[in-house]
Amino acid sequence: RRQRQMCIRDSYRMYHVKNSPGVWEVELQSGAIKHGDLYKLKVRWNGGEGERIPAWANRVVQDEQTKIFSAQVWEPENPYRFRKKVFRAKTDPLMIYECHIGMAQEEERVGTYNEFREKILPRIAEAGYNCIQIMAIQEHPYYGSFGYHVSSFFAPSSRFGTPDELKELIDTAHRMGIAVIMDIVHSHAVKNEVEGLGNFAGDPNQYFYPGGRREHPAWDSLCFDYGKNEVIHFLLSNCKYWMDEF
C-alpha cells in the first residue's frame, strides 16, 4: 500500500478499513460539513503528499479567481424531485439529436442546463426528434476538450449549472417525450494529477495501464486498466450512479 495517511484538508483524519484494500473512512459529527462547503483530500504517501479531489465526488467547482478545482458538498435542503417517474422511449424510429450543452446558444459564452431546457428542447421537439444525445458533461478541467478529458467521473460539469438543474433538464425532456442518452467517457481520462486520477495516491498506475499502454496517443490522455477489478468496479459504479441519480 502506497498511501500511508489520508485526511480531509488536515481537519479530519481518515483511517484505513481493516481487510479492505484501498478503503478509508472517517466519521464526522452532524453539521461538520454542510451544503455548499468545499473540500479536498490530503493524501500522504512514501516520498510525497498532495491535495486530491475524491474520485467519487459528485460535485466539483472551479474558483473564478484562482482557477483551482475543489469538491463541493451538494445536499440541498429541497433537492429536485422528478415529476416524470416512469419514461419509455419511442424507438420506432429513434430520431437522435446530438448536442453539446455549452455550445447550444448563439452568444460567445458557455451555455447552461437551464438555457438548454428553456430554449433548445422546444426547438428539438418541434423538429420531430424524440431523443437527445448529450455530449460529454462529466467534469473536465479544459473546456476545449468538449468534455472528453474527464477529471471527476461522478460530477456533472458545474460550468453548465448544478446537478439539480441537469435533473430538471432531463425530467423536462422526458415529459416532452424525448429520451436522453448521455455520452460518458470510460475509455480514457485526463492526465491531471491535482484535479484528476493521474497520480491519486502516489501510484501513477493506480487506475491506468503501465508502460506503453498507459497513454492514449490521439487524446494525450491516460487509458484505464480494465484488468483491475477495482477499476471495473469504479467504472460500472459510475454507470449505475448516472442511471440511478439522473
Language model features: what each stretch is:
Residues 3-8:
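Short, small-residue-biased leader/transition segments that mark boundaries at the very start
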Residues 10, 37, 149:
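Residue-level signal for beta-strand positions within conserved beta-sheet cores that form or flank
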Residues 10-11, 83:
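Short structured motifs
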Residues 11-19:
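Short, surface-exposed loop motifs enriched in S/T, G, D/E and P with embedded aromatic residues
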Residues 18-98, 103-108, 115:
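The feature marks proteins involved in alpha-glucan
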Residues 61, 79, 83-91, 100-246:
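Substrate-binding/active-site clefts of carbohydrate-active enzymes
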